[in-house]
Each structure stands twice: as C-alpha cells, then as structure tokens.
Regions:
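Acidic, mature catalytic/reactive cores of soluble proteins
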Residues: 1-353
Length: 353
C-alpha cells in the first residue's frame, strides 16, 4: 500500500480583502534531523535521509531559512491553497486553484458519506459520529494499527515533565476501539485492526516472555524504547520536551483479556473476510496456555506502575475474560479446549492485592 498522504488547505475569499501569510515548518525525527530544502516558484521539497515532503501552492513560495512562507492577497471570489504530500516521488507538478478546491471538496464529501454506514440511531448522534470519525483518523491504513492518541508532547499536567508521545498502538486501547466501531456498525475498520491484532498473536506464539507486548509501533514492529527528548524549544514558558512513551517490556496481564474479547467479538460476528483458521487457532491456544501458567503472577498492571510488580485484581479478572472468550470460541467452532477447569479454579483463587 502506498505511503502517500496529503494535507490540503484551501483559502477562499468571501468578502472584502485579506492579506494572508502561510508558513510550512517541518521537523524530522522530533526535530533532531536537519533537512534539505529546494524551492522553485510554487513548489518546495523537504528531504531528510529517506523522508520526503513535497509542497505545492497556488501562490508563490519563498524560502525562510529551513522553512517556506507564502504571502498573498485574497479578495472576494478568489481561491488559493496548498497541498503538502508525503511519500511522493519525482518533481512537484503545478497546482491550480481548481485542483485545490476539487481535492478539498472530494475530501469533505468522503467524510460526509462515511458516517452514513453507521447503525447508531440513539441520542447525540452527531457527537457519536464525530467521535467515530476521530477513531477512524487514528487508524494507520498501511498496517491497520490504531494509535492510542494523536498527540506527541501534550503534558499530563501543565508545567509537568510527563509529555508523552502516544502515537503508538496499545493492545488495550485498540481493543476498546474495536468494540466501539463494531457497536456503531463500522465493521471494516474494526476488522482491519482485528487483522493487525491477530498478526501480533501469530508472530509471537510460543515465545517465553509471553505472546503479546502491551504496545507496538503502528507498523506492528515491537522495537520500542523509551527516550527523553530534551532539545525542543520552550513553548509558552513551559518545558516542551517530549518523552517517547515506553512501557513495552512491562507485564500487563489485562491486555490478554482485552485482546481475546476483541478476537471473540470479530470471530462470532460472522464478518466477511474474518475468521480464525487452524493455524491461527493454534497460536491462540499457545497464548492461552501461557496465560494459564502466568495469570496469578504479579504485574505492572493497567496503571503501568514503575515501582515494581504487584497483584492487581483488574489484570487477573481480565485474564479470566481471556480464558472465557477462548472457551466460547472453542465451543462455537467445535475446537479443542482444555481451559475450562482452569477458568473455574481462577474464579475462586484470585490473589488479593
């Protein structure tokens, strides 16, 4: 699948006359990597190693150090705009005001049509549909990964130090989103993340450290390390350094319950192009077998504690959910099952915190 993505900005004059100034200031690798810039009339190309951004404009562009600016006047009836594209190769093509408006209107039309497939007919429908649109925008289409939040440095507390980059995929957050999307009738988006999740189960089946990581990069890779970025400039007098979030090596037992809850929902929903085959079922069996051996272990839990592992009831409850959903899947498809007794024992022997 192509990694080409475009941001379209259209400027239309309604009445009067307005002096307009626009700037494009990209920063690669959290601002740590310098880039090359080439500006030619109404086009500009930003390049940093293997990353490339291409900017085309109706109005003329001018270089401002490593950035690009455009100054123009908009009068009633005038149209101008910009297209910023990633992944494009070759030289930028000249773009006219008509093409900018077409791209803008086509994009708007798509997002107006998309909620029509929703099955939701309850109260506050507009707010619900806007929330669904936000969830869809958080899906990385090439892989199906769903980011926990589209933020990269908002502080948990004003003036605080925990400015996390949440543009990673947490199994827990993604699983919750599957249920939200399924409940609203957006089965395609739910299925896409289900495929992403099933691939993670398949690739880690039988590994001694546990079949699942709690979080991944959006492309599905698990090479995630925590890193503090001290170099960003101060913003509004507050420290704006960002932390690349990482608790990826923690044990959080609840993710198995959330993952299996989602897989069961998709498997039992008779969705087109979804199904757990023989090999996939064997990988699920390996995951549940591992969980049966470890679900009474202390863990860092849903709160990602940094002070050592402890028994957390929520994680052990969700471990039971994982066993329950696996048993249901086995029963509904006449698959082998061996965990019924383990699930029954677990309800009577959950350790206290």
């Amino acid at each position: 699948m192509s990694d080409r993505r475009r941001i379209v900005r259209a400027v239309r004059g309604i009445r009067g006359e307005v002096e307009f100034e626009a700037s494009v200031e990209p920063r690669f690798d959290y601002g740590r990597r310098s880039h090359r810039l080439h500006v030619d009339g109404t086009a500009a190309v930003f390049e940093a190693n293997d990353q490339r951004l291409q900017l085309t404009s109706v109005a003329a562009l001018e270089r401002d150090s490593d950035d690009v600016r455009s100054r123009f006047t908009v009068r009633a009836g005038d149209t101008s705009g910009f297209v910023l594209e990633s992944g494009a190769s070759g030289s930028p093509h000249q773009i006219g005001d008509g093409e900018v408006i077409r791209l803008f209107l086509d994009t708007g039309a798509y997002w107006q049509r998309w909620p029509e497939q929703s099955s939701y007919r309850g109260r506050w429908r507009e707010a619900v549909e806007r929330s669904a649109i936000t969830l869809k925008l958080m899906i990385y289409a090439p892989s199906g990964g769903l980011v926990a939040a589209p933020t990269a440095g908002l502080p948990e507390q004003v003036g605080g130090s925990r400015n996390r980059d949440y543009r990673y995929t947490w199994v827990r957050d993604g699983a919750f989103s599957v249920f939200a999307l399924l409940g609203l009738g957006f089965t395609e988006e739910a299925t896409v993340f289900g495929e992403w999740l099933r691939a993670r189960v398949d690739e880690r089946a039988g590994e001694g450290s546990g079949p699942l990581k709690i979080m991944y990069r959006i492309d599905g890779s698990s090479e995630v390390t925590e890193e503090t970025l001290d170099h960003p400039r101060r913003l509004h007098g507050l420290a704006s350094g960002a932390d690349r979030e990482c608790a990826s090596d923690q044990l959080q037992l609840d993710v198995y319950g959330e993952a299996m809850n989602s897989i069961h929902a998709l498997d039992s929903g008779a969705l087109r192009d979804w199904g757990v085959g023989h090999e996939g079922w064997q990988h699920i069996v390996a995951m549940i077998d591992w969980l049966c051996a470890h679900w009474h272990d202390p863990d860092e839990g849903i709160w990602e504690t940094r002070g050592g592992r402890r028994h957390i009831v929520y994680g052990q409850l969700m471990s039971w959910v994982a066993l329950d959903r696996a048993i249901r899947m086995a029963a509904s498809r006449s698959r082998p099952r061996t965990w019924t007794a383990g699930a029954a024992r677990g309800t009577a022997s959950t350790p206290r915190s």
